[in-house]
Amino acid sequence: MKFQRLALILALIFSNFFAYTQKSGGGEANPNLHTNKEALARFQDNRFGIFLHWGPVTLRGVEIGWSRGTAVPIADYDALYKEFNPTLFDADAWIKTAKASGMKYIVITTKHHDGFCLWDSKFTDYDIMSTPYKKDIVKDLAVACKKYGVDFGIYYSIADWHHPDYATRYGGDPRPVKSSEMSRYVTYMKNQLKELIDNYDPTLIWFDGGWEECYTHEMGMDLYAYLRQLKSNLIINDRIDKGIVGMEEKKYEHPEKYAGDYETPEQRIGAYKVDVPWETCMTICQQWAWKPNDTMKGLENSLLTLSKVVGGGGNLLYNVGPMPDGRFEKRQTDMLLDMGKWLDKNGEAIYKTKGGPYEPTPDFVSTRKGTKIYLHILTKDLTEVTLPIPEKVKINKIVKLEDGKSIVFDTVDNNIKLRLTPSTAIPYVVEIETNTDTKQLKTIKRNVY
């Protein structure tokens, strides 16, 4: 009897642990609706994507959505679409740049908090077809992604401060609010999302703006179930619901309650979690939408961020704000292409990998795939690293990934000591070939020196 009681207690403990580490799916209202495993695996294998924040607001060079009623008066902001004519937009050029930069998927802001739609929507006139440009941006990008083998994802804001039925106002908007109209807005939102899925077939939907009180946990779970009925292998981020781990670092109290397939830390590198899918979204400059002369992150910073994110178990969604005329800034394009050159030599340590097994340190992070462990060196002029090696794991050889040059190492007890040639070019990757399936290794704590 005592054994049975102990077994029951252990079962409850591990079931709660499993619910935490595997947080994903339709939430408590849809207990049998789980994340599509194959689609999630593809998403995680991609590891690196491009985020694109774009719309008429770029004509003013201020932030998308948030500047409505603040930096730009509401009436002026809402009329910007009448001037929006990005005649130099070339979907093929965008996607070829993304692909050459090593990015495996895109996410485009089809509708931000300002409510403007970048596609030809039959449910509103506040869209791209009402601009002087009169061409479907989303359609062109979807076609280009298919042409060049890049996964196509869409951003869609739940918050819509322009729509009369959305039951929250922002930026001093004087229009009255009627909470009873929110149900009409939800219908509008579902109609638009069905339109986007039917017409453009995205692999993922990246929600945002669900934090306001007029949008509820129940609405989030219902919307998730609705979308998965429309497309069973759709991947949906956690911002569809109310339990996000995002900008405010709000932690899940009961993660299994909430809908969503992966977590979305914003403008920060997520914590080391290799059993919970997550994606850091971060800007290449300071602002999400284009801003003239915005401060831009350099190549080293960008590559270090990529290594740290993937070494922690996450994806990196790196944001570019296209200019009003439809082009990427040359300096941003050049930097992204330089990232692509690094990935041409080191991508094996990024794509289709799992974070770990070594817990991240200031000097390095690690990724793994097959029988190999990849050590991403983050510190300049590092000359030596000592690593504990799990029992029964044998080291066959160690090389620098980019050129295949051997790295001298010594084995002492259950540790290996790597002797590195000092380098000022970081990150660089050391490939450790073992005799075991490295993805099965447990996390090795930071008792390294």
Regions of interest found by a model, annotated:
Residues 1-24:
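Bacterial Sec-dependent N-terminal signal peptides
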Residues 22-449:
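Mature catalytic domains of secreted/periplasmic carbohydrate-active enzymes
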